Amino acid sequence: MNLEPQLFIGDASDAEARVYATLPRAGLADDAQLIGELIGPHCRYSKTLPARIRFVDRGPGPTLLAEAVVPDPCFWTPELPFMYSVELRLAGAVAAENEIAPAPPAMRRPFGIRRLGVHGTSIYLDAKRFVLRGVHLDAPKIEDLKAAREAASALYIEEPSEAFLQEASEEGVLLVVRLGEMGAQGKLAMELARLGRWPAVAIAVLNDEVPAGKEIRLSARSMLLAQRLNSGAATPPASIAPWAHVLWWEIGPTESAIVQPPHMPVVAYRPTAEPAAIAQRRRNCDHLQADLAPLGDFAGYFT
């Protein structure tokens, strides 16, 4: 039984943000509740006065649900990556067949309140249109994050460790994570839930053949899901997966036949073997944008 609550953000404005913790009720005692606090914020690049906001149980339902209402929230952005700490525990007990087992130990983990979404053909970050620009790294190291921040570059990576995800979140570096073959859908959901704990993860890129319905978004409430399309792929509306928020288009060095769907964001990625520094490769994103300008505006550019 997985007894780790899932955190997600509800309504969020400059005045207040609502943070929720949820856990399936199956197998729990009737009086079980999630209780705890949201503590913070803290930020490497700004001084703050931390507060403690209590999680309040929201009553009966198919899941346990607790809510923390954060006044004057400090949102996570690459410029100011504000982080909070969540402390939660399961009050009551776990029903174990014919007896009642003690509740599991308290959970404490970092959390960022980030506003990220799509509208039309654009990505929005912190309620503003945001064009994502970044570089691909085959074997990213934690030391790369400083260079990425200095270059205002996102990173496109695979299989990041928990330590890398935490450092990127503290440093303010946006990540696009490509997921390989996950096999069973349950494994995919677990990996999306792991990535979704960190505000640095903006997009998870899934293969276009992933046999998932729109419900897979429930495992990725805090990030965007991108459908990966190869160079030259046709994209009639019927070929777009129901779970996709974004299309991730891998293009060749002289690609010119991209047809941008009118109703959703497209991020263009041009792979390169150039062993340049992150700052130089980040500047290449501007060249890619210029090359693709006759085709229209894209939601992001990666090299």
Q: What are these model-predicted stretches?
A:
Residues 1-303:
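Secreted/periplasmic carbohydrate-active enzymes, especially glycoside hydrolases
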